[in-house]
Design a protein with these regions (language model features):
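Extracytoplasmic/secreted envelope proteins and their assembly/folding machinery
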Residues: 93, 97-101, 107, 187-194, ...
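A structural "domain/chain start" motif
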Residues: 20-93, 204-228
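Short secondary-structure boundary motifs at beta->alpha junctions and helix caps
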Residues: 80-87, 158-199
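C-terminal motif of bacterial Sec signal peptides marking the signal peptidase cleavage site
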Residues: 15-18
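Bacterial N-terminal signal peptides that target proteins for export
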Residues: 1-9
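Envelope-exposed proteins and targeting segments
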Residues: 51-53, 67-69, 76, 84, ...
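Surface-exposed short loop/turn segments
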Residues: 20-42, 107-158
Length: 228
């Protein structure tokens, strides 16, 4: 009987140790990193508040391999990989879309800036394709240089007529080969690209507004009755 109890005790302890092993891991927990929109100064000139148009930012497209929550990196010999233990809070195109909307709204040069889910109509549509959003190790240094490139098309809502295209980019070298430094370089490169996007989008729409001035608003009806 004592022998059976001893065997049962050993079995319980073994099962407990096995179960404990199932719920413990030596792997570091995955870290989520985010980027902030740049503080864009309000440019001089531009469109007057009354003439300021509205803009909708369509859901961005991305080159193959980039639309993911992974922080992507490029290595020699045309290899693409990603950092383990790190992720963006959303797929990259969703994050870029939010940053574009925040940047354009903060400029104060638009009557309204809406994302792709807005139910309200807009005067212009901005379509962005992300060509690069990666940490580039192909130059041979110990730390990467982050590259961001955005291909932009602006069109009128009416008739879907394209009125301008441009490419903006930004690059920033990471101070060291450490995730915190690499994420900081991602933010610097993205800030440069978004700041340029804001300026060029405004220039394209301002030029279109000058070529096609809108009809002035109709005068408001007077509430006064004619004198008898």
């Amino acid at each position: 009987m004592k022998h059976c109890l001893r065997l049962l005790t050993c079995l319980v302890l073994a099962l407990g140790a096995a179960c404990t092993g199932l719920f413990t891991s030596n792997e570091r927990p995955e870290q989520t990193y985010y980027l902030r929109a740049p503080a864009v100064p309000t440019p001089e000139g531009g469109l007057s508040p009354k003439a300021a148009p509205s803009l909708r930012v369509a859901r961005p497209f991305a080159d193959p391999g980039l639309d993911t929550t992974h922080l992507m990196l490029l290595e020699p010999d045309h290899r693409m990989s990603f950092y383990t233990g790190a992720r963006w809070p959303a797929p990259m195109t969703e994050m870029v879309s939010a940053l574009v909307v925040q940047t354009l709204r903060a400029s104060g040069q638009w009557r309204s800036v809406a994302d792709s889910g807005s139910p309200f109509p807009s005067d212009y549509l901005l379509q962005v394709t992300v060509r690069r959003f990666d940490a580039d190790y192909t130059q041979g240094g110990p730390a990467p240089t982050v590259q961001v490139a955005l291909d932009c098309v602006i069109g009128r809502r009416d008739g879907r007529e394209v009125i301008g295209t441009f490419v903006v980019s930004g690059s920033a070298a990471a101070g060291e080969n450490r995730l915190g430094a690499v994420v900081g370089a991602f933010e610097q490169a993205t800030d440069a690209a978004l700041t340029a996007l804001g300026s060029q989008a405004l220039a394209v729409v301002s030029a279109d507004a000058a070529r096609h001035p809108q009809n002035p608003p109709s005068p408001e009806a007077s509430s006064q009755r004619p004198s008898q």
